[in-house]
Amino acid sequence: HMDSIGFTVRYQDQLVPIGGPRAVTGYQLVGEDSLGPIECELVENDGDLHYKFARGIDRGTELVFKKDFRETDDFVQSCYLDNRLGIFNALKVAETLENGVIVFSCWEEHGGGSVPYIAKFIYEEWGVRQALISDITWVTEGVLHGEGVAISMRDRNVPRRSYIDKIIGIARESGVDFQLEVEGAGSS
């Protein structure tokens, strides 16, 4: 998906989260309103979210985390890469895809998500019954860097076991290194 977690300016200096951002005082946020570019500081106080900036910011302005891009020989680190790398993967698939549908959505972080609507449309229009989602996970105690792609067996949702088994079989037949991911939160 192409949308990003962040914040919407409410009243005075109040912020409302978009998606589920981790809010820590001192994080730098960026955006732009009718008066120009914004680079402000996030302030969290007992669950209340505010910004610190030299002037008021227009209501409804979206603020996102300032990028802090880092690259080494083994890692690339920056906010929002999960979404952007998923898009890159889909574009690479598009180079050779025949008789398929690739979707770029932009409503996932705002609550509800667009996937149920898109899935219904794709099924009704073309009869497509199965889909893969290209998302980028994080390193956890069960998903290790460099050990292969993560096949999500469950997150907040539980996909059909027969479908997971089919994907695992395809990965094995193709010689793709993979790991099995089991999480209790998040959702693809």
What is each stretch, according to the model?
Residues 2-188:
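N-terminal hydrophobic/helix-forming segments and targeting peptides
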